[in-house]
């Protein structure tokens, strides 16, 4: 709710000036999820939907809405998610898969891009006179392009192979 509340405050102020820009920070998980990240992906997917709707709704007021979709970024997020995965790893049914997911995530975040890349992407989205609706950045973000061109079954197989073996 805090995102919506802040956006509403900005819209009231910027609508009168007939210019302004909202930059929402999402994740590639908003467009595709991996095993073990369903709830996180759902929250990011919701932010993507809100951003798309706002972009359409606010256009006539001269307001722009931009979405930044980072891939794997070295932020320490893996330490937070590791706690959840470790709790699930004790389950006799889900445990073996969650251990493989945890190993996959740890490897991915180790190879992740720097947070500075996201900061530069946000700055670019703010500074350009004609921003794109979406900006991808960071490791694995190119997967968003690939996902659009292959059948769902093949995509699922690729994700499963990379995350749960």
Residue ranges and their predicted role:
Residues 43:
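Active-site helix of classical SDR
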Residues 1-8, 12-14:
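Single conserved hydrophobic/aromatic residue that forms the stacking wall/gate
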Residues 60-109:
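C-terminal beta-strand-loop-alpha-helix "lid" module of Rossmann-like NAD(P)-dependent dehydrogenases
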Residues 65, 103-149:
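Core catalytic loop region at the nicotinamide-binding pocket of NAD(P)H-dependent oxidoreductases
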Residues 32-38:
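Active-site loop immediately N-terminal to the catalytic Tyr-X3-Lys motif
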Residues 14-17, 59:
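Helix-to-beta-strand junctions that scaffold the AdoMet/dcAdoMet cofactor pocket
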Residues 46, 50-58, 68:
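Hydrophobic alpha-helix immediately C-terminal to the catalytic Tyr-X-X-X-Lys motif of short-chain
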Residues 27:
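Residue(s) in the substrate-gating loop at a strand-loop-helix junction
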């Amino acid at each position: 709710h805090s995102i919506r509340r802040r956006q509403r405050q900005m819209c009231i102020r910027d609508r009168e000036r007939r210019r302004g820009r909202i930059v929402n920070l999402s994740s590639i998980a908003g467009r595709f999820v991996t095993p073990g990240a369903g709830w996180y992906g759902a929250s990011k997917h919701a932010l993507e939907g809100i951003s798309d709707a706002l972009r359409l709704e606010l256009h006539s007021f001269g307001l722009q809405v931009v979405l930044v979709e980072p891939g794997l970024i070295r932020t320490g997020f893996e330490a937070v998610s590791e706690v959840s995965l470790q709790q699930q790893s004790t389950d006799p049914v889900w445990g073996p898969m969650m251990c493989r997911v945890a190993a996959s995530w740890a490897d991915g975040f180790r190879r992740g891009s720097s947070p500075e890349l996201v900061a530069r992407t946000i700055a670019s989205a703010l500074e350009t006179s004609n921003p794109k609706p979406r900006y991808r950045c960071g490791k694995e973000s190119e997967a968003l392009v690939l996902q659009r061109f292959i059948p769902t079954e093949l995509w699922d197989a690729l994700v499963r192979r990379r995350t749960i073996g």
